[in-house]
From Swiss-Prot:
GO terms for cellular component: cytoplasm; plasma membrane. PANTHER family: HIGH FREQUENCY LYSOGENIZATION PROTEIN HFLD. It is a peripheral membrane protein. It is found in: Cytoplasm; Cell inner membrane. Keywords: Cell inner membrane, Cell membrane, Cytoplasm, Membrane. This is High frequency lysogenization protein HflD homolog. The keyword Cell inner membrane applies. Signal peptide: none annotated. Belongs to the HflD family.
Amino acid sequence: MNEWQQRVIALAGMSLSAMAVQKLARSGELYPESISNTLVHSLLQQNPDNIEDIYGGLDNIKPGIQAFIRQAGSNKNKDIEVTRYLIGLIHLSRRLLKQPDILNLLGERITQVKRQKEEFEFENYRIQQSLAGIYRELISPLGQPIRINGNPEFLKRDSNQHHIRTLLLAGIRSAVLWQQVGGKRRHFVFSRKKMLDTAQQLLHVA
């Protein structure tokens, strides 16, 4: 994978998270379940061999690549709400990268959750509950919280709150990854075509 492919894959991870948050907040459900599984998988992969492994392979991140193309393209399919979520994820991730102590603690806490899943076979709900707690304790205090729009009936459910925070944490993970592989905000202005061309190429590979 070249640097642009890596950046687009990370952006696809962010886009998948934002899209999933919107869908869950509006409908109270997230289908297919593989989307959530891919994002949780990305959180628990701390020493991957390559960037695709973070998401369990290119096939799993394909919906995120498609979502990124919709958001970054010049067509009418852009969703302002998803864009706002993406901006919020980038903002919080930049704050996180400026606090290495919090970043290290985040890694330690996620390692604990990974151990719970592998050694004690915790159910998905328990894993989401743990990951949501990490988001609430370590990410939320970093700055202006990401305001989630949706159906109040769905948003007040504890299970959905845990799920949304887990999805946001996965989005933060992808946003950090994007910056670690050289992603810059100016790329959205000066390198948009390059990113979109790369995304289209990845779709044909995935």
